[in-house]
């Protein structure tokens, strides 16, 4: 019983500290490095990991007040990483930071998060900038059609991964944030998600070799199942742990099937 309790506490720490979501984002980035044959650069990975922790911390708070020493260390490390990146990678980080700031801070009493349907696309776009374009620019990879296809594919996938969170938050978002569940209902949201999963898998089938296709097919089906079983009343671990686990599981599959 004690070991189970300790595991639960550890999982709670990973979730509350935003370490787990950072692991999820970095898993997508490493998957891109594997697929494209890129080097996994220390500074790019470091700034993505700790930058995600910082971004989600400020989003939860709704302001930019730093209340812990550990977060100050994260910020300092991110600055250190930033000045060791390629200039194109720095532009990605700056763009992501600007979007994160306006996602949180209101302009004329509104932030990007409060604009109808914008929330999900901003989050997905930031994930793709960090997980796809950051490692590509840092490794000076030649941009080709495949890069655009995988960007679109991952963008679609991340949108579907966000939908269970929007379903969970429907009762909180109704009065202040317009999302697909609050505007069109849970059933419509799930149907939309299934269509997007199908699109994600279709793109994968035509652009990827077998090992990547198998990894993405399994991960896509798991994503669809998590969406199917999503509801407004759910365990606190359903989205924050299990849904966030999908990119991590995908990376493991990708490594095993190479």
Where are these regions (language model features)?
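Solvent-exposed interhelical
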Residues: 48-73, 155-197
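Interhelical loop and helix-boundary elements at the membrane-water interface
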Residues: 2-23, 61-71, 104-125, 179, ...
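Helix-coil boundary and interhelical linker segments in multi-pass alpha-helical membrane proteins
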Residues: 27-46, 78-91, 131-152, 203-213, ...
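Functional transmembrane core segments of multi-pass inner-membrane proteins
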Residues: 120-170
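Short juxtamembrane and helix-loop transition motifs at transmembrane-helix boundaries
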Residues: 4-11, 56-62, 79-87, 110-113, ...
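Intramembrane alpha-helical segments
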Residues: 65-138, 226-227
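Transmembrane alpha-helical segments that form the membrane-embedded catalytic/substrate-channel core
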Residues: 50-61, 95-109, 129, 154-170, ...
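Catalytic cores of Mg2+-dependent Asp-rich isoprenoid enzymes
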Residues: 6-49, 53, 190-201, 208-258
């Amino acid at each position: 019983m004690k070991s189970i309790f300790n595991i639960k506490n550890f999982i709670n720490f990973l979730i509350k500290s935003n370490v787990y979501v950072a692991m999820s984002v970095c898993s997508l980035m490493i998957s891109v490095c594997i697929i494209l044959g890129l080097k996994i650069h220390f500074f790019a990975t470091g700034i993505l990991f700790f930058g995600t922790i910082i971004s989600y911390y400020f989003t939860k708070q709704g302001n930019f007040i730093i209340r812990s020493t550990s977060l100050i260390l994260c910020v300092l490390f991110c600055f250190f990483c930033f000045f060791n990146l390629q200039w194109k990678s720095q532009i990605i980080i700056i763009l992501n930071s600007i979007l994160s700031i306006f996602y949180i801070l209101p302009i004329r009493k509104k932030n990007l998060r409060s604009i109808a349907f914008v929330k999900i696309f901003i989050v997905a776009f930031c994930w793709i900038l960090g997980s796809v374009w950051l490692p590509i620019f840092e490794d000076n990879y030649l941009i080709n059609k495949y890069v655009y296809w995988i960007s679109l594919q991952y963008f679609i996938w991340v949108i579907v991964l966000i939908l269970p969170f929007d379903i969970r938050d429907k009762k909180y978002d109704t009065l202040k944030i317009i999302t697909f569940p609050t505007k069109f209902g849970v059933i419509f949201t799930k149907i939309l998600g299934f269509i997007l999963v199908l699109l994600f898998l279709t793109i994968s089938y035509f652009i990827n070799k077998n090992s990547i296709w198998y990894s993405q097919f399994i991960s896509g089906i798991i994503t669809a199942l998590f969406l199917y079983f999503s509801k407004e009343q759910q365990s606190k671990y359903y989205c924050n742990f299990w849904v966030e686990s999908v990119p991590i599981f995908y990376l493991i599959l990708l490594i095993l099937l190479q």
